[in-house]
Amino acid sequence: DESGEIYLSWVSQDAEQATLAFARLTSEGWDAAQVISEGRNWFVNWADFPVLSVDSSGMVAHWLQMSATGTYDYEIRARFYAQDKATWTEARTIHTDGISAEHGFVSMLPLNDGTTLISWLDGRETVHSEPPGAMTLRAGIFDKSGANVSEWELDHRVCDCCQTSSAMTENGPIIVYRDRSQQEVRDIYATRLVDGAWTLPQAIHNDNWQIAGCPVNGPSVAAMNKRVAVAWFNAKDDVPKIQLVLSTDSGLSFSEPIVVESPNTNGRVDTTILDSGNIIVSWMDTVGEAKIMLSRYDINGELLSTTEVAGSSPSRRSGFPIIEAVGNSVYVTWTDIDATPQVKVARIDY
């Protein structure tokens, strides 16, 4: 949260049900786990996973729950926790379409008035329209009671199963995601909330990656004041590549891309910014056994260091590593699938 406290959420499963829980890191270690929700009909997925958003006014957490018998008929369920009431709301569905279709790939961003900006991929048009439409990107602002303050469709045609990502700039929120053109070009786009309206989505760089299916590899954005960093994966011409662009004007314009790694990667990126202004990009190295890597850049995009965090696996079960900065330290969390799967956390001090 904004005070520098670290919270970790995870999903555990047994034969009967799935459980979403969280814990807070204290000076003595992790405090007791607290259960947010549990259920027997959840959609638990390696790439589309729950998010916990925390600030001084409270918390928001979501999970995915099956809504019909189709493989990808699932909805986004959420609970909201108001700090002043010290209670969680009843679970609610954050989208109001009532259509059994794919809804997921959520990102959350606390706003300074105690509300939360939630963005998600929404498949209502894929089953509701004739002929079937495409996956859409939607966003809404929710208060701590779970009420929907406002909602928008941000893009009418996006990649079906790549994560969305959001960050707060000095000039307001920015959301990045993988677009999908009529010609099946799936490049990374951004839209910003300016004076109550969302800007026309723009490509952060024209990779012109034409691919007939979803690569399941979303972008990641981090921001500090007017500085914005976006990292993403593409494999145009079958050459895997992670790139990074920087902005000094809250995402209005971006630098030319910096190649973080190519070709020994399968993506799965995340980004964060240290108090020093250094930018950290996490990514997967696929040379030999897979490894979780951190690359550190200065504000001008110069590479300062590359750190191997841990061995991993290229399999889907290992999921997507997540990073968060506190001061000039980075916390990394990932799923270790050796023997019994478990969630691990490491701290790297810079």
Spell out what each predicted region is.
Residues 1-350:
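Extracellular, repeat-based ectodomains that mediate carbohydrate processing or recognition
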